[in-house]
């Protein structure tokens, strides 16, 4: 695909595609890393990455390919894995000599050759720091950091344009070289997509590669340009296979008689069709239409240089069990305190906070709560009745990163929007309208006839002095945490029953580090 230059003019839109992008998805990455760490073959070992110390409803972060072969999906709940393995073993027992197992194995090849073995699997607790370490060292041997966009721990986009001449390779050869190196040094195999823009390489990887036969090492590499995309993908269904097309989008498109990307592309050529798409999706219609035609103007350089006009920082957690209101309030306080430290560490301030509190499905299964609750009821993803979540926003007097100001405001908001009789399961805190502290303009004070300007100035100076002292303390805490670990210094509230900050400090992305 290297060297391909396609220039077209369609409906007044010219595209010059000279770039070559590679998307790489490390296959069952977390599970593969855990297998490699144990000296096991990632393609021949039954393993799930899941924290068994949580409830059996915990989500498995990864499932090894051999275990997926039994019909277990990629991101199941742990109880679903247990149930499926029990079903498989019931069938295997019927075929075993004397209908009895003589042992068990988590190795697929052994299970395939010996029907007297019971299927078992390894449940590996997640180790996010280890996965990040593997991920960061895989690609930088070949590609400079500025040409890599890390989409997730196990998936990257690479702008390979400048490297094809350097290495004297085609894009396919470069992708294969990197994947073979990964396989040789880690035992982890991969799927890759090559395209003339970031969207096409993603689709090549997500759809085309995953529907083609793998080589002897499980490697799949597919390529797309605009013309082959239209030829191969315009009739592909379902639409939800495509990047950024969720069930909601697909349902709205279906009501308009649009079932494929080809349908959307053809529909967009008429003035009526284009207006209808913009009416349905607003400004997002432009991206949908571009993708229907295989266009994507955004480059990795654009992604790296992007700075949103209105930035925000958020933190959320799903509690391990239905939690009483007072404990949820303590956890919210901890999250607000950590949010303030995060802002300070990044040199940012905020003047608006948002809180979302999700209630547990058990609420409406408890007789006393069900009788007394008079609020709105909604259905969750599984069709179960649950009280509608609480959501609210509070504005601060001025942009700050003060833990005292932020926690007090968040507690005021929590008390205002939540129902103290309900059990809580999810909490999300947001700092909105985040800006660098250096960009905050000095406040203009409006004088009036009814207040003493000198007293107001003295009050303002006292507040500023308090904020300055608190900032010094917060910076000292940050320094200790960065040097000795996040749990090296804690507040007294973090030691109370039900507090989660200490355990969260040992996690990355909500999972064990």
Predicted features along the sequence, with ranges:
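Gly/Gly-Pro- and Ser/Thr-rich, intrinsically disordered tail segments characteristic of DNA damage-repair
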Residues: 2-300, 449, 454-513
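DNA-contacting surface of Y-family translesion DNA polymerases
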Residues: 23, 241, 247-424, 444
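Short, charged/polar surface micro-motifs in flexible loops or helix N-caps
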Residues: 27-29, 53-57, 359-364, 434-438
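Generic "edge-of-domain/loop-turn" microfeature
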Residues: 54, 165, 199, 318, ...
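Short aromatic/hydrophobic contact patches that present stacked aromatics
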Residues: 157, 395, 428
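A glycine-rich phosphate-binding loop feature that marks nucleotide/adenosyl-phosphate handling sites
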Residues: 196-199, 290-293, 349-361, 423-435, ...
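C-terminal hydrophobic structural anchor segments
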Residues: 412, 416-479
